[in-house]
């Protein structure tokens, strides 16, 4: 075996051991009665987040655009054991809605322990067609509203020694095709909240930030988008949601799900030519 191959194998082993041994243990009881706001909670990962928090006995406020669907999710959350469960419809393309949602959650729950930012706006899965306006709109929904909600929630989270949990993507770490506007918003999230982690630490803040890097998850919207473009295993949304909750509860700075997202991020700059070839060959493109 050549030297560089041995070094690579050793690095992988060290990284794996470091991740397995450094992650703090998760105590489900710590979330009993916790005051949680989850965005994008009508379907997909956000819906699963709401159900897990409910099962763990948290107090929940959920938001998304469709009030009728949120009502059904809240009803199920109450059945599953949520101490309290409320919903508020909101459109995160409207800057005033972001403030109103945080204000509503604080009023209903008496404060916040967790702000879980998960919502995204719809975006076509295709080669970029030059539509700058759509990218600008998506930045408002997927990025700027996150900043606005974090800013609004920071004072109450400081008092409760709470956490901001940001649901991001491997596409915010590695450049892939067909989702450029979406990926741009995730790169922006990773950059901003990664920097905010350092600023809060330097200020000795009580607030932690967890950035969750997700790979392909089996939500209905994701499966519909990638059909005919990529053949890759999709991982369960309920497992992704539980991983997000555990990472936030244990105040990890960064979390990766599924396993390959960690290694893809770790080695992305080691072999750029190979990396790009793997990415390009993983997709189907028929001009």
UniProtKB/Swiss-Prot annotation:
Signal peptide: 1-22
Enzyme class: oxidoreductase
Domain of life: Eukaryota
Keyword DNA-binding applies: no
Annotated binding of substrate, by residue: 169
One Pfam family per UniProt: adh_short
Gene Ontology CC annotation, any one: intracellular membrane-bounded organelle
Enzyme nomenclature, EC number: 1.1.1.-
A GO molecular-function annotation: oxidoreductase activity
InterPro entries to which the protein is assigned, alphabetical: 11-beta-HSD (IPR051253), NAD(P)-bd_dom_sf (IPR036291), Sc_DH/Rdtase_CS (IPR020904), SDR_fam (IPR002347)
Localization per Swiss-Prot or TrEMBL: Secreted
Keyword annotations from UniProtKB, A to Z: NADP, Oxidoreductase, Secreted, Signal
Gene3D superfamilies in the cross-refs: NAD(P)-binding Rossmann-like Domain (3.40.50.720)
Binding-site positions, NADP(+): 40-66, 91-92, 118-120, 182-186, 215-221
Active-site residues annotated for this sequence: 182
CDD domains membership: 11beta-HSD1_like_SDR_c (cd05332)
Known catalytic reactions: cortisone + NADPH + H(+) = cortisol + NADP(+)
Protein purpose: Unidirectional NADP(+)-dependent cortisol dehydrogenase (in vitro).
Family: Belongs to the short-chain dehydrogenases/reductases (SDR) family.
PANTHER family: HYDROXYSTEROID (11-BETA) DEHYDROGENASE 1-LIKE B-RELATED
Name of protein: Hydroxysteroid 11-beta-dehydrogenase 1-like protein
Gene: hsd11b1l
